[in-house]
A protein has these predicted regions:
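Flexible, solvent-exposed loop/hinge segments and secondary-structure transition points
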Residues: 23-163
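N-terminal secretory signal peptides that target proteins for export/translocation
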Residues: 1-4
Length: 163
């Protein structure tokens, strides 16, 4: 009987040790919620309306998966896919999509072969506590205006997440 108790205690102790050790290895990851995505898109939409811009606004998570898409009135339909591509590019490559547009413009056409890359200005990573947690893509106006609107949305991330 004492032998059995000892075995049970040893097994319980080992189980506890393993579970604590495994828990210590799991990283904590901040994620972009739909509520925060709505607030980020609202900031970008306000900027677009202030400029009189007709654009598509896309917010994706850190894997480039769609969280939210808004197509403002009178925005061309083609901007939907372009906006998704810009946002996805900024998220999965963790840098503005303009980086790839600049590479192509400068003759580095190999950037066109990158899987999932849309080398067009207007995609901006959403950074929170030093980590890319998603991205925003804007399409419909000039490349610079698209990026400027996206930057306003991305800059609102900390406030959107905190509230």
């Amino acid at each position: 009987m004492a032998q059995m108790r000892r075995i049970v205690l040893i097994v319980a102790a080992l189980s506890l040790y393993v579970s604590i050790a495994m828990k210590a290895e799991l990283p904590v990851k901040k994620v972009l919620t739909l509520d925060a995505a709505k607030k980020i898109a609202a900031a970008a939409e306000a900027e677009a309306k202030k400029r009189g811009a007709t654009v598509v606004i896309v917010v994706v998570d850190d894997g480039g998966h769609l969280l939210l898409l808004e197509r403002l009135d009178d925005t061309q339909v083609a901007s939907v896919e372009v906006g998704i591509g810009k946002a996805r590019t900024a998220a999965i490559f963790r840098r503005p999509s303009k980086v790839f547009e600049d590479q192509v413009r400068d003759g580095r056409v190999a950037a066109l072969a990158l899987p999932g890359a849309t080398p067009l200005q207007g995609g901006v990573p959403i950074v929170y506590e030093g980590k890319v947690i998603g991205a925003i893509g804007v399409s419909g106006n000039t490349p610079q205006e698209d990026e400027d609107i996206a930057k306003v949305g991305a800059a609102s991330a900390a406030a959107a997440i905190a509230n």
